[in-house]
């Protein structure tokens, strides 16, 4: 039990104008709506009923209004609701007064319903409900129309409002758990009956709740209006003992009342990343549900519904678990398990580990960020996901009330009445048993549940673990046969040399640079493997990616083989756990010889060279036969089916079936047959060598893969004379044959983890069958058979086409038997005669010549080269619909009206040299465009306009540049805020015209980045506030953006520090990006940028460059359409980038909806880049992408070259506008009617590409407007900060460098306090110039981002508590947080500030008398801090500064930490096991200088906070010093603070 001490410019287009975005989309929820929110609950520990608790719940809900959002009318809330104990006092009196019926509470229930609006429909629905209740032996006591005040609704919510009724019933037979189940069964029967009858209003019928215990009031209202709308909630007779509340932020603005939360049991803040897989596995599982209470499954199923939200489906599955005898906490442990493997907190809780192990064998996790609050009336509680990606703070009061919410301070409580404060950590749970009146902590409730059944015994009896055996020690095939098979399966020499060999040597995926400038597989003239038609999806905004390297403790690639038929009872089925899905040939032999019956299906089909249709029919028929064979094997008891193409290809008349097609087809077929859960699929294939290939096979249903030909290739390569010579000469590591095979497999495993993690998925078992891809280039018949549920928007290959491409690949192996080397098709690197590359040498030379000679005729030659290229992008299949009404060229807007729409891509100074970076900035400023700083900060010297340029174009301020002019500006108009926050200071932010939040990058979405130490020169280190030579890691996610409401908070932060700038958000094109963009617009961004998959990069895994993201044409079209549909298009500017090179590209982008246009690679080429493609090596031969001084001196570019390119581009655009008959770009934005399919473009592979989604429009009604300005009524300022900055005494102190102290009240709705003040000071004095002192004392609970961007001269002292993001990007000053003096609890043990504090801080001090949440000091650059406890991942990615922790710490300390020093007090002797030692080392405090620094920081902590614990430490210093650990990254290992010998050497000198 928890210990509680008593005292201690666009075209407006109608919604109907667009066809469905996805032609193949049975799963609309997955792509068209996502949500986030603020949640919480309040409960009386003694289960006492009262109306005060209801009023408290409404107050708490109202204080989280900023976590929700509204529709485009800015008045209709996305949803708010409250689930609470049924106020039986009210309903008993109502029944007696109006129905003359005395309710028996133990047998009665109340259902809350949304009904259709028409009175006739209402009556029909009521009749059905009554009829079924009566058929099931219920007495219908009566209907009650719920009173409401519709005037509080916004226009859209009112338009879609249902009729709201309650029905009160009483069972004649049932009570208790039996009543619960029968209410569930009756509700499902009613829902199904209405669906079966297919009434036009069926979608408007909805049960909010139907229970003996709980009732739900919800709607499309703001949280501040819920009680005003539902007058019942203010009724004093509405006495309750608990309430769950929820405020929704949806990425869709069309009101849908049923999607408001809480659901019937859960209030969910998060996103299920594996939803499609979870739904399909649940569909497969339903046919084999086995439990005594489920003898009427047919009346209950289907349990899940693809048209429902992730929250609604999760709620339905939890509900099912409840009705087969499990509790809410148990169901959530089953479905959303914590990270139990290698968890030091659980090492003494073996039975709990056994529970998780047992469940993992039968139930995949519903994986993703989630804070879930829940109640079924028996318990109320909350559970957090395994990564802790949502905040959850709680407190207990003296009058025995428990409050938990997404924020602290949701109720204004007297501090003296609070007995306990805490938070949920990753994977943790808190539960109040209402019947037992028992509050249970995380381990209490979980150990109690784990002890209910003998899970350890069940595991011992029924589970085996496959112990991986050694690899083969010799080859199994002659070299010529290997060569033949490699050719048949589609290997090229690049696959061997760049991928397989690299992985075998290094044990990691190969890294490459720039983007993918080759044709899409479906457009290519070369044969491709089927995997190339699949693009990986990734997380952006609505959920974060994970760092699979530094946070591996939450990830697992283990999975299970065998039958998984029953999730509800003890099962005698044997299962086999495998620790990796990558199997060697020996592993496969062990599996075949295991207790699990295993059979093999050979996956080949008969080839007919003379008839594509016959080939297609042969392929289709063979797959159908395999499916039927598999079903027969399952019915005969087979538990594992191996799909194998390991056969000898003796003739051309036989071809393998692409393994992805086989596994996908079987997976889908077996689900539909209801037997999928009875068998595991293993793929034994020669066509699998890249991490992307493995991900596809697993994502479509395979449990494991044996890549026999890839392993054989590794063996032959190792045994080759060339490899042996290289090893003997020391030119490559001296590795054994076993080691290279192991390296290859480990690199695949690491690559898989990265693919999972960039979608925010932690567990391979959740990824298997989850289909987290988008298809580019497969037709409906192929998708429906093998990949149902995966979106394929442009159609593509039929079975005949696919069969022919496969046969072409396979037959090539027979025609090239005498060759000594595989073909090199140039899929990665350009080569003459190979695959076409847009960035080819001929193009680069043509552009260089044109811009250097300033010759438009030469530019036209460059343009013609690109116009005559083979089809490469989707836009190549489109053409302009020229009309006869052209306009004279002189009437078209001038060049500089067009160039002001141009931007360069976000390329960092660090990835680029100073010369290249500054040249681009000057050029863009000259033409009125906007350059983008990229990540990494910017030299403040660049913020001043040049005035010292001589007649030769040189400036002493920038002696390394040429071709300068007086009046030039080197300041990037767009300054980027990326996940590393390098160089983000107040001064940097206030010198921007736009601030760009980079969520994703086209070439590596969801992956973050890394600047190698060799590129961190002294100059780069100065800008990024770190030491030279230190590797700098940018995390995959922004650690202050785990959800859409988090993004809204960051946008709000930026608007505070720089109120004059617009905020842009950079996204990468993928299915569903339109949904995300709607959320981004609602979050307050004025600009949304959509990047294509072919964008450039300084360094990225090769598989990401080739296989992640989709073309910008699809993303831009989707975003524009959905913004129009949601009435938000006028509020944002749309920008697009990714492979734009010509005016034709720009005009096509405009027609698809873009207002502005970004250029990266082509701008660099104009500036001198020769596409050497060695950016990742720091060896660029022309000084563009290097920090080596001698190479930078070779940089050939001058600003005029870049200016010339953009002038030529604008002139080309003017000519096209003239031909189209328009005078401005604004007039054609979104004009899909000006696009046609280009029938002149002939494709090699198929005639089935469908581009109609881009130009099929049902009406031509347009209303032309100028470029939107991003204006909104949405509040963009902190009222408290506004009042502070408009206070005359503060303004006087700022202007005159005076000292001033003020005292101010604060609440959780006061967000970003201090940011506006910091921005004002930075604008006036830069980061360091203010010489006065502002001391602001706040009292209460601070909202998010307290002290963000704090600056020198400002002290923020908070007496109370703070929420997340304290001190974000602070550059100076002090932040002090202490509890009120009247608190009764031990302050050092309590949570006083939230998650992700000191994120990206570059200076200043933070002192906190209490503990922080997760990720304290993440990416801290140079701030100093002392506090008394931290959660998981403290000091992650830290590059400088000092952190002192005087209390308990979570796991994974110092992951990715490359600089700075941290000190941890280890009172429990368990800290070493919590430190991530991949980079840092841990030692005691060994030097006098370190002791001195540590004691000085603790003394200052005492001075600032009065900490009793710190006082005790100082009093007993000689004892406590021996309990401190010092964490030391390599960059600090040779300093006098960390190295005794260095210290003595310094002293000696």
UniProtKB/Swiss-Prot annotation:
Enzyme Commission code: 1.4.7.1
How many and how are cofactors bound here?
Binds 1 [3Fe-4S] cluster.
Q: What is its main location?
A: plastid
Q: What is this protein called?
A: Ferredoxin-dependent glutamate synthase
Q: Does the keyword section mention Iron-sulfur?
A: yes
Name the keywords, alphabetized.
3Fe-4S, Amino-acid biosynthesis, Chloroplast, FAD, Flavoprotein, FMN, Glutamate biosynthesis, Glutamine amidotransferase, Iron, Iron-sulfur, Metal-binding, Oxidoreductase, Plastid
**GO molecular function terms noted in the UniProt entry:** 3 iron, 4 sulfur cluster binding; glutamate synthase (ferredoxin) activity; metal ion binding
List the Pfam families.
GATase_2 (PF00310), Glu_syn_central (PF04898), Glu_synthase (PF01645), GXGXG (PF01493)
Cellular-component GO terms for this entry: chloroplast stroma
State the species of origin. Cyanidium caldarium
């Amino acid at each position: 039990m928890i210990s509680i001490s008593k005292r201690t410019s666009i075209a407006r287009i109608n919604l109907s104008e667009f066809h469905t975005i996805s032609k193949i989309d049975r799963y609309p929820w997955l792509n068209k709506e996502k949500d986030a929110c603020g949640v919480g609950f309040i409960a009386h520990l003694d289960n006492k009923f009262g109306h005060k608790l209801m009023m408290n719940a409404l107050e708490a809900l109202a204080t989280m209004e900023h976590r929700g959002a509204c529709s485009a009318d800015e008045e209709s809330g996305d949803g708010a609701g409250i689930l609470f104990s049924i106020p039986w006092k009210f309903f008993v009196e109502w029944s007696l007064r109006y129905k003359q019926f005395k309710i028996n509470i133990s047998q009665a229930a109340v259902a809350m319903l949304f009904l259709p609006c028409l009175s006739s429909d209402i009556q029909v629905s009521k009749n059905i409900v009554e009829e079924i209740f009566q058929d099931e032996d219920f007495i219908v006591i009566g209907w009650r129309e719920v009173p409401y005040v519709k005037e509080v609704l916004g226009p859209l919510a009112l338009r879609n409002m249902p009729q709201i009724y309650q029905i009160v019933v009483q069972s004649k037979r049932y009570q208790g758990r039996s009543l619960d189940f029968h209410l569930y069964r009756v509700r499902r029967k009613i829902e199904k009956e209405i669906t079966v009858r297919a009434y036009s209003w069926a979608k408007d019928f909805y049960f909010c709740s139907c229970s003996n215990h709980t009732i739900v009031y919800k709607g499309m209202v703001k949280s501040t209006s819920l009680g005003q709308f539902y007058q019942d909630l203010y009724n004093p007779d509405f006495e309750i003992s608990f309430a769950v509340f929820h405020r929704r932020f949806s990425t869709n603005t069309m009101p849908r009342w049923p999607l408001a939360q809480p659901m019937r049991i859960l209030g969910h803040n998060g996103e299920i990343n594996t939803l499609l897989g979870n739904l399909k596995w649940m569909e497969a599982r339903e046919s084999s549900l086995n439990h005594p209470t489920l003898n009427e499954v047919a009346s209950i199923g289907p349990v899940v519904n693809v048209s429902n939200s992730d929250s609604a489906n999760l709620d339905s599955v939890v509900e099912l678990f409840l009705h087969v005898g499990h509790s809410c906490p148990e169901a959530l442990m089953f479905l959303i398990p914590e990270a139990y493997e290698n968890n030091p907190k659980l090492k003494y809780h073996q039975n709990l580990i056994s529970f998780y192990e047992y469940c993992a064998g039968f139930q995949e996790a519903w994986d993703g960020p989630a804070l879930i609050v829940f109640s079924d009336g028996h318990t109320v509680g909350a559970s957090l996901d395994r990564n802790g990606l949502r905040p959850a703070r709680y407190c207990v009061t003296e009058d025995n009330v428990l409050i938990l919410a997404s924020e602290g301070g949701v109720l204004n409580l007297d501090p003296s009445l609070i007995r306990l404060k805490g938070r949920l950590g990753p994977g943790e749970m808190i539960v109040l048993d209402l019947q037992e009146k028992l509050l249970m902590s995380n381990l209490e409730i979980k150990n109690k549940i784990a002890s209910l059944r003998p899970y350890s015994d069940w595991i011992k009896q029924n589970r085996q673990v496959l112990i991986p055996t050694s690899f083969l020690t010799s080859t199994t095939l002659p070299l010529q046969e290997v060569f033949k098979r490699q050719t048949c399966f589609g290997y090229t020499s690049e696959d061997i040399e760049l991928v397989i060999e690299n992985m075998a040597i290094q044990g990691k995926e190969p890294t490459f640079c720039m983007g993918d400038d080759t044709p899409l597989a479906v457009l290519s003239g070369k044969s491709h493997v089927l995997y190339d038609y699949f693009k990986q999806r990734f997380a952006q905004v609505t959920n974060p990616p994970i760092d699979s390297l530094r946070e591996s403790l939450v990830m697992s690639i283990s999975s299970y083989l065998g039958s998984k038929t029953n999730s509800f009872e003890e099962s005698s089925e044997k299962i086999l756990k495998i620790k990796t899905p990558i199997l060697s040939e020996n592993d496969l032999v062990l599996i075949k010889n295991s207790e699990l019956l295993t059979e093999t299906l050979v996956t080949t089909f008969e080839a007919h060279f003379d008839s594509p249709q016959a080939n297609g029919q042969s392929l289709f028929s063979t797959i159908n036969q395999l499916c039927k064979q598999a079903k027969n094997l399952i019915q005969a008891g087979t538990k594992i089916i191996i799909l194998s193409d390991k056969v000898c290809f003796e003739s051309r008349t036989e071809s393998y079936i692409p393994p992805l097609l086989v596994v996908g087809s079987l997976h889908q077929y077996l689900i539909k047959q209801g037997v999928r859960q009875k068998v595991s699929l293993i793929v034994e294939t020669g066509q699998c060598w890249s991490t992307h290939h493995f991900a596809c096979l697993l994502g479509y249903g395979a449990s494991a893969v044996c890549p026999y030909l890839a392993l054989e290739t590794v063996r032959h390569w190792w045994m080759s004379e060339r490899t042996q010579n290289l090893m003997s000469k020391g030119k490559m590591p001296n590795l054994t044959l076993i080691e290279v095979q192991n390296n290859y497999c480990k690199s695949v495993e690491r690559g898989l983890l990265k693919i999972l993690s960039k979608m925010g998925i932690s567990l391979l078992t959740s990824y298997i069958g989850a289909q987290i891809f988008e298809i580019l280039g497969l037709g409906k018949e192929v998708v429906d058979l093998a990949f149902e549920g995966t979106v394929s928007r442009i159609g593509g290959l039929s079975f005949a086409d696919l069969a022919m491409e496969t046969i072409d690949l396979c037959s090539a192996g027979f025609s090239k038997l005498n060759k000594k080397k595989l073909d090199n098709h140039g899929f990665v690197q350009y080569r003459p005669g190979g695959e076409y590359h847009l960035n080819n040498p001929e193009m680069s030379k043509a552009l260089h010549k044109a811009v250097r000679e300033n010759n438009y005729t030469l530019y036209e030659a460059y343009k013609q080269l690109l116009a005559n290229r083979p089809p490469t992008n989707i836009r190549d299949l489109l053409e302009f619909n020229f009309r006869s009404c052209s306009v004279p060229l002189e009437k078209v807007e001038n060049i500089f009206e067009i160039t002001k729409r141009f931007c360069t891509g976000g390329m960092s100074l660090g990835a680029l040299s100073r010369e290249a970076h500054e040249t681009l900035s000057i050029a863009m400023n000259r033409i009125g465009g906007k350059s983008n700083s990229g990540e990494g900060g910017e030299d403040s010297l660049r913020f001043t306009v040049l005035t010292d340029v001589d007649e030769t174009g040189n400036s002493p301020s920038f002696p390394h540049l040429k071709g300068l002019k007086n009046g030039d500006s080197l300041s990037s108009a767009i300054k980027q805020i990326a996940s590393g926050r390098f160089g983000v200071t107040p001064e940097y932010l206030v010198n921007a015209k736009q601030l760009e939040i980079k969520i994703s990058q086209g070439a590596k979405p969801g992956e973050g980045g890394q600047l190698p130490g060799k590129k961190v020169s002294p100059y780069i280190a100065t800008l990024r506030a770190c030491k030279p030579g230190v590797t700098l890691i940018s995390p995959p996610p922004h650690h202050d953006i785990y959800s859409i409401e988090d993004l809204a908070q960051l946008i709000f932060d930026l608007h505070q520090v720089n109120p004059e700038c617009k905020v842009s958000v950079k996204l990468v094109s993928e299915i569903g990006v339109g949904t995300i963009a709607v959320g981004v617009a609602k979050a307050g961004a004025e600009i949304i940028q959509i990047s294509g998959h072919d964008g450039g990069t300084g360094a990225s895994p090769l598989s990401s460059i080739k296989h992640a993201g989709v073309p910008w044409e699809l993303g831009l079209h989707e975003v524009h359409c959905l913004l129009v549909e949601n009435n938000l298009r006028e509020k944002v500017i749309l920008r697009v980038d990714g492979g734009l090179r010509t005016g034709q590209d720009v005009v096509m982008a405009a027609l698809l909806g873009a207002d502005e246009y970004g250029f990266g690679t082509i701008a660099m080429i104009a500036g001198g880049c020769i596409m050497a493609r060695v950016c990742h090596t720091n060896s660029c031969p022309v000084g563009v992408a290097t920090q080596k001084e001698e190479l930078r001196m070779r940089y050939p570019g001058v600003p005029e070259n870049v200016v010339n390119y953009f002038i030529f581009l604008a002139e080309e655009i003017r000519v096209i506008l003239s031909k189209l008959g328009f005078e401005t770009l604004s007039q054609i934005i979104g004009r899909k009617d000006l696009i046609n399919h280009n029938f002149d473009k002939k494709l090699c592979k198929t005639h089935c590409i469908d581009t109609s989604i881009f130009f099929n429009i049902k009406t031509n009604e347009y209303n032309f407007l100028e470029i939107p300005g991003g204006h909104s009524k949405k509040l963009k300022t902190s009222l408290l900060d506004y009042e502070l900055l408009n206070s005359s005494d503060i303004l006087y102190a700022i202007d005159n460098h005076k000292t001033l102290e003020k005292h101010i009240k604060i609440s959780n709705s006061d967000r970003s306090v201090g940011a506006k003040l910091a921005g004002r000071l930075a604008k006036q004095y830069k980061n360091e110039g203010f010489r006065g002192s502002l001391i602001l004392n706040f009292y209460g609970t601070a909202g998010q981002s307290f002290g963000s961007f704090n600056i020198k001269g400002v002290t923020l002292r908070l007496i109370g508590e703070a929420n997340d993001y304290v001190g974000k990007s602070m550059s100076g000053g002090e932040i002090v947080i202490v509890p009120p003096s009247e608190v009764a609890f031990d302050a050092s043990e309590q949570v006083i500030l939230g998650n992700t504090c000191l994120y990206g801080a570059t200076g200043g001090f933070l002192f906190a008398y209490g503990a922080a949440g997760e990720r304290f000091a993440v990416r801290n650059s140079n701030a100093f801090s002392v506090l008394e406890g931290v959660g998981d991942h403290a000091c992650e990615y830290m590059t400088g500064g000092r952190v002192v922790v005087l209390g308990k710490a979570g796991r994974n300390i110092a992951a990715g930490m490359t600089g700075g020093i941290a000190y941890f007090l280890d009172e429990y002797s368990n800290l070493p096991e919590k430190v991530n030692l991949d980079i840092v080392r841990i030692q005691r405090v060994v030097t006098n200088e370190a002791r001195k620094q540590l004691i000085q920081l603790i003394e200052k902590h005492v001075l600032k906070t009065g900490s009793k614990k710190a006082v005790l430490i100082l009093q007993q210093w000689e004892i406590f010093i021996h309990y401190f650990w010092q964490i030391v990254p390599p960059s600090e290992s040779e300093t006098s603070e960390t190295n005794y010998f260095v210290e003595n050497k310094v002293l000696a000198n």
